[in-house]
Amino acid sequence: MNLLSAKNISHTFEYELFSDVSFELNAQESIAIIGMSGSGKSTLLHVLSTLLTPDSGSVSLFDEEIQTMSKKRLSSIKRHDLGLIFQSHYLFNGFSAYENLEVSEILSREKIDEELLTRLDIKKVIEQKVTQLSGGQQQRVSIARVLTKQPRIIFADEPTGNLDKTTADEVMKLFFEYLKNKGAGMILVTHDETLAHKCDKVYKLENRQLLEIK
């Protein structure tokens, strides 16, 4: 099943970051995007996740073109079907880690998975305010929140950037298990080529073009 389709999208920020980008994301599929710092990887992820509008071309989610969706429909998709993991985490600072997860629990109507908390090693700090947590702990809370939400597509920008190798490997196992069990898809941006090649497909953003290398 096709979850996302990008057709000939381009975007400029002071200069053209990427041009004529096209690809598709299918159910149970993981795609990694690599490239040099400043190549436009994160901007591309923002366009694909509807946070930015492409200058040209189109993005479709679940066979519906974003540009023709009603605001109500797009808002519903963002709330329920898209999971975003970015380097800034976007956690609610006044809340505890558990309260941050409860926001996703309400959206998905699923119980918070205690095993998930254990595997991400955040069970012991779950009642603490997120401002008291380290960067790595905040990142793991952000990952747990997205998986609790149970989105159809995960967009992840350097999701293992603040984690040690053992924890990073466990996070990737969680992602791949989730994609398989829920029929979801994931687009991941990373500078780590070893991590990228764990995904089904790898694209490199270079000289404004997106090239499939795996």
Predicted regions and their residues:
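Conserved catalytic motifs of ABC-family nucleotide-binding domains
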Residues: 150
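ABC ATPase NBD coupling module
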Residues: 66-83
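Conserved ABC ATPase "signature" region
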Residues: 65, 110-125
